């Protein structure tokens, strides 16, 4: 009986992987985006393998089939500043000193944050990053799509990038990217931007059916 249950479970997992390819077809600016194409989907075992697969030059369909949690490397009593926008004291949002001169002459303070959020996961060319059901979560890090092309990100949730601090982290960063389709992506609890572009132009980018966080005020006034 135990062997039978194991076989059934293994078969179910294989079926989930086989059916977890990209759903739908990109359109408009994203029409030429193919990601990892028809490469056999595979799920990384842990955060180290996910990091490696995302960054390499191999075409891949990467299944996000569980929560990949990058939290745990805290910077304690690190340098931050108190910007003019923080009029709420301890209840407000201070800024992490990230070495670009943003804090300027603002009063300094110390803070504790998770280092993972400050730098996103590098994404190489020809990648499909696909969540499996509702399980696909990347916690503590965003995606950094810089100087690369042909990337699909679909059905994942990126969350918890130092939301209490300015410069806490970006969910998805594009810089010099080409042919990118971001679809059905949920973003929550980020300390800087949900989607951000850098100084280099990015071309043929399609955002569709994605869910940035909205407070009650914005939810009443914006269409998703």
Q: Where are these predicted regions, by residue range?
A:
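Generic detection of short hydrophobic beta-strand segments and adjacent strand-loop junctions
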Residues: 42, 68, 121-123
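Fungal secretory targeting signals
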Residues: 1-20
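Short loop/turn segments at strand-loop or loop-helix junctions that form parts
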Residues: 65-67, 156
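Short N-terminal amphipathic alpha-helices
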Residues: 64, 72-74, 96
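Short, solvent-exposed loop/turn elements at domain surfaces
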Residues: 51-53, 70-73
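Right-handed parallel beta-helix
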Residues: 77-224
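Acidic Gly/Asp/Thr-rich repetitive segments characteristic of extracellular carbohydrate-active
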Residues: 23-63
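Acidic glycine-/aspartate-rich tracts in secreted/extracellular proteins
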Residues: 48, 67-70, 134-135
């Amino acid at each position: 009986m135990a062997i039978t249950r194991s076989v059934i479970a293994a078969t179910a997992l294989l079926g989930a992987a086989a059916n977890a390819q990209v759903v739908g077809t990109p359109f408009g600016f994203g029409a030429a985006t193919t990601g990892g194409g028809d490469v056999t989907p595979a799920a990384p075992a842990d955060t180290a393998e996910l990091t490696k697969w995302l960054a390499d030059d191999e075409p891949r369909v990467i299944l996000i089939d569980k929560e990949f949690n990058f939290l745990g490397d805290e910077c304690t009593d690190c340098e931050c500043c108190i910007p003019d926008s923080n009029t709420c004291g301890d209840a407000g949002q201070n800024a992490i000193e990230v070495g670009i001169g943003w804090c300027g002459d603002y009063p300094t303070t110390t803070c504790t944050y998770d280092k993972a959020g400050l730098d996103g996961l590098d994404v190489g060319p020809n990648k499909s990053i696909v969540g499996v059901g509702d399980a696909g979560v990347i916690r503590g890090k965003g995606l950094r799509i810089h100087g690369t092309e042909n990337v699909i990100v679909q059905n994942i949730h990126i969350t918890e990038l130092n939301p209490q601090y300015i410069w806490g982290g970006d969910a998805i960063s594009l810089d010099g990217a080409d042919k990118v389709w971001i679809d059905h992506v949920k973003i929550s609890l980020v300390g800087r931007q949900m989607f951000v572009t850098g100084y280099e132009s990015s071309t043929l980018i399609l955002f569709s059916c994605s869910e940035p966080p909205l407070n009650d005020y914005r939810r009443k006034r914006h269409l998703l």
